[in-house]
Every structure is written in structure tokens, then in C-alpha cells.
Amino acid sequence: MSMQVVGKGLFVCYSVFKKCSSVILSLIVLLSLSACNAEDAVYREYRCYFLFDTQLHPMPCQLTGIIGNPGHFCHVEASLEKGIRHIKSTRNYDGAVEDVPLTTDRENQQSCILGANNCIIIGTSSYDNVLIAYEGQCANCLEQYGGTRYPLSWQNNGTLLHCNKCDRTYDVNNGTVVSEGGGRQLYRYQAAFDGQFIRAWN
């Protein structure tokens, strides 16, 4: 084999490697940017940490019922009664309220912090079948007035959330304002389901 052929082969290999390296580098940059954007969208003004074990609380538990059911959401609040933590959920489509006592040692020892005023909204979007969690107070009122008590109520069979303070209405499936006047969308927390635990955090 002549040196000329070997040289051409090496040149071709180098060219392919250079192109592949450029593509891989571009992908890494894009993934990094999208990860940063996702992180930037997470509300961090008030701490959120919620963990719910669906194996300990199987169906017909309302919170467990949001998994895999597009359009199903719950208001979630926490309280401590006689040393036992309770999770109160209010379902969007019928307003049903459920009180779930967390009676195991593990559940009672873990933190439960629910945003600005002890309330988050969590469920599965009917637009993209993704689990999402929102701050339970009106984002525009939190931003405009300060304080922490601007609760949202279900409307239109649970597809909308309404704030009585500013009269804004939000689409529960993506958090955007759908009433006149516009405004910022609902604040979001990270949310995930790993097959056992429903999580929301920031």
C-alpha cells in the first residue's frame, strides 16, 4: 500500500472525526441550555418539598389517582394533628376532599413543605400527559402585592383555577392566564413520579 493511499485514509478519518466532534459538542451545548431553562422555570421564592408514597396509599386515594390520568389535579395541603401529619387533597373535577393520615414512622419523619402558604397544586396535564406541580397561590398577586395568601379555586369542572383577589383565571393544564388582562403564568415546582413516589420540589 502506498504512502499516498494511507495519507488519504488518515485524512478521511480525521475529517469524519472532526465532523462528529462538532455534532456531539453542539448536542451537549443544546442539552445544557435546555437543562438551564428548565431549572430557571422552577419557582424558588418559597421552599417546596413533597413526597407521597402511592404504594402505602393505593387507589382509590385521590392523590394516587392523578397518576396517568390526564386532566386530574389536586390541591394539596398539610397539617399536623396529635403528632401525625395529614395530607388534605381537594380534587379538581368534583371538589371531593380527602384527608390522608401519614401513620408510618418514615412518612412522619420526612419533611413536608408546601410553598408560600402550605398549598401546592399537582396533577397530570391533559395537553402532554406530564406530571406538573404549581405554587398554590396566585402568581400575579404574589408578585404584585407581596404576602402569601392568594388562594386559587377550581372552576369550569376543574379545568381552570381562579383568583378572587385579582380576578384572573388560569388554565390548570399549562398554568397560563386565560382571562382578560393577561399576566404571568402560575409558578411551577419540579414534579416527578418514579413508579412509587409522587414528588414535588425546588
Q: At which residue positions do the language-model features occur?
A:
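N-terminal pre-ligand scaffold of iron-sulfur
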Residues: 40-153, 190-202
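C-terminal motif of bacterial Sec signal peptides marking the signal peptidase cleavage site
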Residues: 32-35
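Residue-level signal for mature regions of secreted extracellular proteins and peptides
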Residues: 29, 131, 156-159
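Short Fe-S-cluster ligation motifs
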Residues: 164-202
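Sequence contexts marking disulfide-bonded cysteines in secreted/extracellular proteins
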Residues: 37, 139, 164-167
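Bacterial N-terminal signal peptides that target proteins for export
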Residues: 3-24
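Cys/His-rich short segments
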Residues: 145, 157-158, 162
